[in-house]
């Protein structure tokens, strides 16, 4: 039997290599997908072979992640429950896509992953595999063996597998779009998140940072007048605004699997870009377009979070989003200081704002007759309803 394992290099998936080999008498091929995590990929490959993999692949998917996935997180203002920029959720379908490519290439009968039975990721991995490689068997060792961390360490030692046991008390998942932090005291939603949990948003600079972001058709193309591709924009902003302490998210999240969980994220570039994009949208769309786009954004975010990337509705929403975003071009001016961001102004290329109409000091004013007629018609629904109800 041939099995392809989505391999992170951590304890769970390292132990899974040997467990899969022995349990299924299988040849295990491992695939690590680089979506921007700060890992030592040489050491990960080395660890995979020592644990028993017959072949290992490291795939650089950072540019792919930015251009095909994060681009839509920006265009669709991807925020689950209006706060979480979907950093972990967004990467999972891409990881599965790359794993499936290898599985099909070598003719693997099964795909394995390290998700547990309590997490959202099992839903995202399983549904993506079913969509892209329905004939493959899905194996999630952590859902089967029910090993604690200590038991996993004991198992690895018994098999002579040198393991990386992180000194950190936190469980970290990291990619280009964000860093999620779980475990230890963070699990208690009544407790303050310790400062040692953070890495990307540790304030190392006290100055007031001003940034201009230029958008073209809904996507950022310049930072402070310097042209760069989307991957570079994200990397630059993560460093610039993260070092000023901006980009932390903490909330009680409604998981796909039926319970609430305290979640903490560091998402500096994501928040700056989404907030700026939303501001430019508001300055450009008609009121009806703006309300419609907000409803699309919410539906898109829910689908991505729930692991339904391959749901046809997601693609339909993106087509509408592309059509609306063709008008989102211009500049947004922001300021970041002491962990806070504020928008200083914006210039939308297609903004219908008219100073002549909006100014109180000059230009157009409706007549008294026009104002009275508008107000009468505008309020008619409410006034007639009150009268019919006797209130």
Curated annotation (Swiss-Prot):
The keyword Cell membrane does not apply. It catalyses: L-citrulline + L-aspartate + ATP = 2-(N(omega)-L-arginino)succinate + AMP + diphosphate + H(+). It holds the Pfam family Arginosuc_syn_C. L-aspartate binds at residues 116, 120-121. The keyword Ion transport does not apply. Pathway: Amino-acid biosynthesis; L-arginine biosynthesis; L-arginine from L-ornithine and carbamoyl phosphate: step 2/3. It comes from the Archaea. ATP binds at residues 6-14, 114. It is found in: Cytoplasm. GO terms for cellular component: cytoplasm. GO terms for molecular function: argininosuccinate synthase activity; ATP binding. Disulfide bonds: none annotated. One of its GO terms (biological process) is L-arginine biosynthetic process. Keywords: Amino-acid biosynthesis, Arginine biosynthesis, ATP-binding, Cytoplasm, Ligase, Nucleotide-binding. Coiled coil: none annotated. L-citrulline binds at residues 84, 120, 124, 171, 180, 253, 265. Its EC number is 6.3.4.5. NCBIfam families: argG (TIGR00032), PRK00509.1 (NF001770). Homotetramer. Belongs to the argininosuccinate synthase family. Type 1 subfamily. This is Argininosuccinate synthase.
